Amino acid sequence: TMKLDYIYHSGFAIEADGITVIIDYYKDSSEEAPDRGIVHDHLLKKPGTLYVLSSHFHPDHFNRDILSWKEQRSDIRYIFSKDILKHRRATAEDAVYINKGDVYEDENIRIEAFGSTDVGISFLIDLQGVRLFHAGDLNNWHWSEESTPQEIRKAEGDFLAEIKNLQQKAPRVDIAMF
């Protein structure tokens, strides 16, 4: 069985048999305290391999606190967008870094990096027969009241180009997180 948990903002967790994946952790689900909520109260204590993915360096998608989780978990694997390293939010030893087009694969999971219309990457995840897509900051970014018609057309074209690329390489996606 597999369970999808919404954490906060763009943060999600996937709970599968013996595997947990946390994506774009910004803060935990509880408003009471920063170290309370589904991540600290449940997911970090759950047995099995823990994967932590971050799509880019913006603080609402990457919280450096996640690097301290390795003190509690010897079975943690970090997979980050290369812009996190470039912007010195983490060191080369902290994670495996991937760019658009790169694939991370081990005995449990396959993660392919797709593009973004902002910075960083989006993730296509194959896990226990389920294909999931996490968009990161891939979006049709424009604001009607601020953007010119030309900016709106460009934003929409960029977004649709990334979606078309995803569709060509992965015609089936079971769960999408935007």
Which residues are covered by each model-predicted region?
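N-terminal pre-catalytic "stem/leader" segment of glycosyltransferase-like enzymes
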Residues: M2-A16
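Active-site-proximal beta-strand elements of phosphoester/diester hydrolases
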Residues: K3-Y6, V21-D24, R110-S116, R131-D137, ...
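Pre-active-site segment of Zn-dependent metallo-hydrolases
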Residues: A13-L53, R64-W69, L138-A170
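Active-site environment of divalent metal-dependent phosphoester hydrolases
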Residues: S29-S30, F57-F62, I84-R88, D102-Y104, ...
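Metallo-beta-lactamase
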Residues: D75-L132
